[in-house]
């Protein structure tokens, strides 16, 4: 279980009072749970992911994973248990390397190998990883990532992020920069990977349809607080219009 306990975060403000994002925020997320997080800009969604990943430090509070505190664990050490896919398709991959080389690097993540050994992997094994991917990545194993489309790069980032079997996967608006068709293909791939590998997943999104259609649970943040938290039948019966009404009420 991923537990966020009494989390607070403030940023210094040279012109006055500190900018408080969270104050005593607490959320428990079950193992394998796929949680969509929505809310207006500036409400703390990406900040929450940044704190969980170790990119920024919380002001106070605690984060535990499977009853082990990771609050003081360095970011580079958290990468062994926490993977992340960003909104920008150019992040999360090495653009000057081929698809094959990127996958090989991800497969050897955390191993004490030199680069030459890291990049060795059998073609059959790599092709198997790309089976059923609608964006034709299998055909581009020996193409440099910089020549792929945004959707292909984001799909590759997703696959790479899951290869080391992380305990937690953080998705930061990972379909926002894609066209509608490609966005739907990437979210379908996301759901497939999360379900098959049973990864505890937090997905920040502005796409309310995706937030309702995918995932086990929906959380809405507003001014650093949870103003909506639904799952199961309650989530299934929720509509986009009802979410918008709740958002307007929170504002």
UniProtKB/Swiss-Prot annotation:
One of its GO terms (molecular function) is ATP binding. It comes from the Bacteria. ATP binds at residues 39-46. GO terms for biological process: amino acid transport. It is an enzyme of class 7 (translocase). It is a peripheral membrane protein. Its EC number is 7.4.2.13. It catalyses: L-tyrosine(out) + ATP + H2O = L-tyrosine(in) + ADP + phosphate + H(+). Pfam families: ABC_tran (PF00005). SUPFAM superfamilies: P-loop containing nucleoside triphosphate hydrolases. One of its GO terms (cellular component) is plasma membrane. It is found in: Cell membrane. Keywords: Amino-acid transport, ATP-binding, Cell membrane, Membrane, Nucleotide-binding, Translocase, Transport. Disruption phenotype: C.difficile isolates lacking CDR20291_0805 and CDR20291_0806 show reduced uptake of tyrosine. Production of the tyrosine catabolic end product p-cresol is decreased by sixfold, and the intermediate fermentation product (4-hydroxyphenyl)acetate is not detectable at all. Residues 2-248 form the ABC transporter domain. Its main location: membrane. Probably part of an ABC transporter complex involved in tyrosine uptake. May also import phenylalanine. Probably responsible for energy coupling to the transport system. The complex is probably composed of two ATP-binding proteins (CDR20291_0806), two transmembrane proteins (CDR20291_0807) and a solute-binding protein (CDR20291_0805). Belongs to the ABC transporter superfamily. This is Tyrosine transport ATP-binding protein.
């Amino acid at each position: 279980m991923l537990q966020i306990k009494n989390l607070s975060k403030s940023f210094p403000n040279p012109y006055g009072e500190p900018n408080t994002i969270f104050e005593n925020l607490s959320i428990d997320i079950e193992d394998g749970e796929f949680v969509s997080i929505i809310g207006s800009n500036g409400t703390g969604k990406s900040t929450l992911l940044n704190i969980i990943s170790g990119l920024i430090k919380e002001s106070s509070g605690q984060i535990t994973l499977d009853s082990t505190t990771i609050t003081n664990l360095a970011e580079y050490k958290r990468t062994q248990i926490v993977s992340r896919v960003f909104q920008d398709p150019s992040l999360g991959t090495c653009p000057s390397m081929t698809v094959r080389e990127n996958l090989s690097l991800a497969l050897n993540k955390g191993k004490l190998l030199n680069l030459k050994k890291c990049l060795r992997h059998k073609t059959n094994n790599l092709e198997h990883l790309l089976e059923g991917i609608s964006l034709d990545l299998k055909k581009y194993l020996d193409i440099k990532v910089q020549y792929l489309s945004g959707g292909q790069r984001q799909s590759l980032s997703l696959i790479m992020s899951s290869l080391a079997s992380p305990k937690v996967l953080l998705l930061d608006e990972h379909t926002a920069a894609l066209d509608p068709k490609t966005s739907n293909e990437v979210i379908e791939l996301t759901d497939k990977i999360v379900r098959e590998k049973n990864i505890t997943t937090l997905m920040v999104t502005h796409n309310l349809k995706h937030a309702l259609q995918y995932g086990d649970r929906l959380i809405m943040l507003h001014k650093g607080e949870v103003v909506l938290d639904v799952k199961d039948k309650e989530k299934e019966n929720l509509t986009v219009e009802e979410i918008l009404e709740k958002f307007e009420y929170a504002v």
